[in-house]
């Protein structure tokens, strides 16, 4: 993957805004606990546009970052990117995970006009620690402008309350990967939860094998279309215990 190291070290507090935003399709910045990706994986689905991402601050296990973009024209129903902060962690089988505490506080702004995006966690599992994606578990904190998840039927298969938040659960395929999407029934901009509870629900009720390894944990935004849009994550933290 093309990218750069943004001079982030394991200091108690370190501001890296001076490192500047990065705008390349696969650019990223790494700290001890996180990798922050620009990840413009589907930019060619837009008629025009660009996106840049930057890290603002690191304090212990908490990171602050932002991403700004304009995506116009083309396939308005397709995601263009997934700028995100990915946790660096040791892969574990779901049955051996005790907790996945996480917090995320963010704000979103955009110019007038059509704006479609989601804010979501994205978890992937596999039957081996080094295997390819078999299950994808998304947790949508926000669905702006009519954004919708992958679904075989277009309808939720369940309504689930986890912690103090209610979610509609959708299921569908993405190639050979089975995708579960928990979509919050109302926008959450200040989120605190144990993500293990989402995995536990799926293993008990939706057939997710507890022998699967959690191999990826990310949180970010999927834009479909928008002008002068910016997501600012004032704080994000996560751990797999």
Curated annotation (Swiss-Prot):
Which keywords belong to this entry? Carbohydrate metabolism, Glycoprotein, Glycosidase, Hydrolase, Polysaccharide degradation, Secreted, Signal, Virulence
Q: Name one GO biological process term.
A: polysaccharide catabolic process
Task: Explain the regulation of its activity.
Answer: The xyloglucanase activity is inhibited by the binding of the host apoplastic glucanase inhibitor GIP1.
Output the Gene3D superfamilies linked to this UniProt entry.
2.60.120.180
Q: Which leading EC class covers this enzyme?
A: hydrolase
Supply the InterPro entries for this chain. Answer: ConA-like_dom_sf, GH11/12, GH12
The entry describes its oligomerization and partners as:
Interacts with host apoplastic glucanase inhibitor GIP1.
* Protein family membership: Belongs to the glycosyl hydrolase 12 (cellulase H) family.
**Protein name (Swiss-Prot/TrEMBL):** Xyloglucan-specific endo-beta-1,4-glucanase 1
Q: Which organism is it from?
A: Phytophthora sojae (strain P6497)
Q: What is the lineage of its organism?
A: Eukaryota, Sar, Stramenopiles, Oomycota, Peronosporales
């Amino acid at each position: 993957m093309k990218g750069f190291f943004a001079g982030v070290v394991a200091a108690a507090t370190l501001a890296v805004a001076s490192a500047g935003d990065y705008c390349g399709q696969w650019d990223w910045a790494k700290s001890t606990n996180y990798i922050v990706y620009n990840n413009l994986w589907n930019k060619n689905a837009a008629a025009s546009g660009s996106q840049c991402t930057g890290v603002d601050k690191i304090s212990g296990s908490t990171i602050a970052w932002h991403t700004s973009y304009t995506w116009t024209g083309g396939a308005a129903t397709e995601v263009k990117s997934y700028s995100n902060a990915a946790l660096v962690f040791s892969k574990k089988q779901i049955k051996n995970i005790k907790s996945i505490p996480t917090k995320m506080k963010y704000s979103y702004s955009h110019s007038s006009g059509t704006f479609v995006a989601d804010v979501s966690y994205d978890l992937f599992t596999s039957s081996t620690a080094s295997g390819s994606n078999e299950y994808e578990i998304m947790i949508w904190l926000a669905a702006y402008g009519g954004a919708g998840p992958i679904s075989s039927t277009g309808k939720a298969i369940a309504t689930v309350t986890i912690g103090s938040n209610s979610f509609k659960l959708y299921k569908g395929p993405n190639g050979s990967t089975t995708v579960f999407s928990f979509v919050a029934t109302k926008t959450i901009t200040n989120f605190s939860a144990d993500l293990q509870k989402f995995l536990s629900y799926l293993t008990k009720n939706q057939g997710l094998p507890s022998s699967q390894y959690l191999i990826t944990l990310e949180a970010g935004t999927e834009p479909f279309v928008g002008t002068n849009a910016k997501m600012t994550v004032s704080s994000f933290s996560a751990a797999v215990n």
